[in-house]
């Protein structure tokens, strides 16, 4: 089943063309790898898929609804694109609970299970400011998956992780794929793209 349709997508900033005639049909239960040089437009494309920016022309449809026409944002999406907006003096659990309160349909148990899936302890009383970069990345993954979204859009999901963390996140993504999620990843780690992707796109 098609989850995402990208139809002749263009994005220009001033005279610079960032995205040029991007087309793709992305199905549920698959992982799609996007790769290319720095500045090629991967992050811009992901921001467009999440409804964070409006394309210059073309369409993005999520479950048949056109972004910026039928709706502004995808209904069920987990995202890692930029530095997450975590509160420095909240614990990991407190951060996710605060973010979950916006949607009001994620239980404390779901939050705890998401934190445990990424190898963290929901009872850890350390505040976010004291997390290492790797722990911050793990918490960002926990945030992305805690709602069990239909769509995961992940820019550099294994960034800052050690070997154990990389393997853990790869396994989580495969589990999310099995659950039926549509997963978009962009990575400079060639192994991420090669090992995880059902289909690859050069941007």
Ranges and model annotations:
Residues 35-37:
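The feature captures the beta-strand-to-loop junction immediately N-terminal to the Walker
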Residues 141:
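Hydrophobic anchor residue at the start of the ABC signature
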């Amino acid at each position: 089943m098609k989850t995402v349709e990208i139809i002749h997508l263009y994005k220009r900033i001033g005279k610079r063309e960032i995205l040029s005639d991007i087309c793709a049909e992305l199905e549920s239960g698959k992982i799609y790898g996007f790769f290319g040089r720095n500045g090629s437009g991967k992050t811009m494309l992901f921001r467009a898929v999440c409804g964070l920016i409006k394309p210059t022309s073309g369409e993005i449809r999520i479950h048949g609804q056109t972004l910026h026409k039928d709706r502004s944002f995808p209904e069920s999406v987990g995202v890692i694109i930029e530095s997450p907006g975590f509160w420095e003096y909240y614990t990991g659990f407190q951060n996710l609970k605060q973010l979950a309160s916006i949607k009001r349909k994620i239980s404390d148990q779901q939050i705890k299970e998401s934190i445990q899936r990424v190898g963290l302890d929901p009872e850890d009383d350390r505040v976010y400011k004291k997390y290492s970069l790797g722990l911050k990345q793990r918490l960002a993954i926990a945030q992305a998956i805690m709602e069990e979204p239909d769509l995961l859009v992940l820019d550099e999901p294994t960034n800052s992780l050690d070997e154990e963390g990389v393997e853990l996140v790869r396994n989580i993504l495969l589990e999310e794929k099995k659950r039926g999620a549509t997963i978009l990843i962009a990575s400079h780690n060639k192994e991420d793209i090669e090992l995880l992707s059902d289909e690859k796109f050069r941007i």
